[in-house]
Every structure is written in structure tokens, then in C-alpha cells.
Amino acid sequence: MKAVCPGSFDPITLGHLDIITRAAAQFEEVTVLVTANPNKNSGLFTVEERMDLIRRSTAHLSNVKVDTWATLLVDYTTAHGIGALVKGLRSSLDYEYELPMAQMNRRLSGVDTFFLLTDEKYGYVSSTLCKEVARYGGDVSGLLPEVVVDAVKQKYTQQ
């Protein structure tokens, strides 16, 4: 079965990478799908930059590919014959947020959502928090893939 790991990934964190790696061990093919979230600002990285950082961070996973999509997620899964969505859950708050979307996606297309519990060492990690720490010169190594740490530092030194 093919699966999608959707998200804005601005930027990809080690928590995201852990979920993607675990999904890749369970599914024959995993597409990391960079989506535009209308509830979030335009972002630190462009969609193309995010896709490049994800490709570089997942290069060791032969069954992972990266794509982007700007409309309904279920339209992507239907168009590409994908039967599963994979989402990471850090806490019950994530579950409360993700459950109605999972139910709507199932209603619209029959796609199932698989929830993977985040490794406890990444339970507090979010792209937003990492950007906030990095913006003020804090150390985000151990929270982001190394290639992403370098890219984030470069972005903030340019501003």
C-alpha cells in the first residue's frame, strides 16, 4: 500500500523525519507531500526549498519521494492511487485537531489515516518552535536534520 505524509514542513524536523522513517518501514511507498496551510504565514522557506530539504533529509530512504499539492488532500490520494495518510501525534491536542480531518478525508474518498505516536524525545518539537529558537540565535541542532540546521542559520543571517 502507498501512503502520504502531508504537512507544511517549514522546515522538516527530526520529529517529522522519525514519522517518515517509521512510515517507510510499514508502507511500500511513502510520499512526503508539502501542502500549503492557509492558516499559516507564507513561511521561512519556499515550497521548492522545503521539498529540497526533505529530499536531502530522506535520501537514505529508497521508498520515499517528495511532492507538492495545493488543493484537497483527498484529490491527491485519489489521483495517485494512495490508500493511506500517515500523521504523527505529539499529544492529545494533535489528536483533537487531526481526528475531524481524518474523518472528513475518509468520508470524501475512503482514504484511511494512520496515526503514529511521536517518539517522546520529539514530543515538544515543532517547526514553529524551532524557527523561534533559531531566529534569536538558539541552538536547534538535535531538533532538525543537519542540512536543515544549516539552511535555517543561513536564512536568519540573511535577514
Curated annotation (Swiss-Prot):
MF terms (GO), sorted A to Z: ATP binding; pantetheine-phosphate adenylyltransferase activity
A Pfam family annotated for this UniProt entry: CTP_transf_like
Any one GO biological process: coenzyme A biosynthetic process
Cellular component aspect of the GO annotation: cytoplasm
Coiled-coil segments on the chain, per record: none
UniProt keyword annotations, A-Z: ATP-binding, Coenzyme A biosynthesis, Cytoplasm, Magnesium, Nucleotide-binding, Nucleotidyltransferase, Transferase
EC code(s) of this entry: 2.7.7.3
InterPro entries: Cyt_trans-like, PPAT, Rossmann-like_a/b/a_fold
Tagged with keyword Nucleotidyltransferase: yes
Entry-linked PANTHER family: PHOSPHOPANTETHEINE ADENYLYLTRANSFERASE (PTHR21342:SF1)
Family the entry assigns: Belongs to the bacterial CoaD family.
Function: Reversibly transfers an adenylyl group from ATP to 4'-phosphopantetheine, yielding dephospho-CoA (dPCoA) and pyrophosphate.
Name of the protein: Phosphopantetheine adenylyltransferase
